[in-house]
Design a protein with these regions (language model features):
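Glycine-rich, acidic/polar active-site loops that bind/position phosphate-bearing ligands
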Residues: 1-134
Length: 134
C-alpha cells in the first residue's frame, strides 16, 4: 500500500494581494493523474472567501505536478468554487480560456555562498556598508 501526499494549493480572498494557501491530503495507491484528485472542501471564513455562518468552499483540482521536494508528493493547483459549484468571486482563473497553453508557473530558489571566516555572504563588506539605492 503506497501513500502519496497531495498538496492542494489555491489563492485566498485577501485584497489587494491574495496569498497562497495549501492543505495536504494523504491518499493510498494514488496514480498521479489529475482525474484521480477529488474535489475537497475547506473553511472559507479563515481565508476571507466566506462568511462564518456558511463558510464551506470547494477546491477543484485543475493541474497536478510531481512535488520536487517530497517523495511520493504532488502539487495540486486548484480553483476555488462556491458550495453550488459555481466559480468563487476570488477565482480569477475561471475567466481564463482553458485552451490557452501560454500560462506557466515556476519555482525560484536562491543560494548564497557563505564566507566561514566573516560569517557573511561571500564578498560582503566586513563593515556591512549599505548597498545603496535600488
Amino acid at each position: 500500500m503506497n501513500k502519496s501526499k497531495l498538496e492542494y494549493i489555491w489563492l485566498d480572498g485577501y485584497k489587494p494581494t491574495a496569498n497562497l494557501r495549501s492543505k495536504t491530503k494523504i491518499m493510498k495507491d494514488f496514480d498521479g493523474k489529475l482525474d484521480s484528485c477529488p474535489m475537497w472542501a475547506f473553511d472559507g471564513s479563515s481565508t476571507r472567501q466566506a462568511e462564518g455562518g456558511s463558510s464551506d468552499c470547494l477546491l477543484k483540482p485543475v493541474c497536478i505536478h510531481p512535488d520536487p521536494v517530497r517523495r511520493n508528493g504532488f502539487l495540486v493547483m486548484c480553483e476555488v468554487l462556491n458550495p453550488d459549484g459555481s466559480p468563487h468571486e476570488s477565482n480569477g482563473r475561471a475567466t481564463i480560456d482553458d485552451d490557452d497553453d501560454d500560462f506557466w508557473f515556476g519555482f525560484e530558489q536562491e543560494y548564497f555562498l557563505w564566507n566561514p571566516e566573516t560569517n557573511l555572504p561571500l564578498g560582503f563588506p566586513k563593515d556591512q556598508t549599505p548597498q545603496g539605492q535600488f
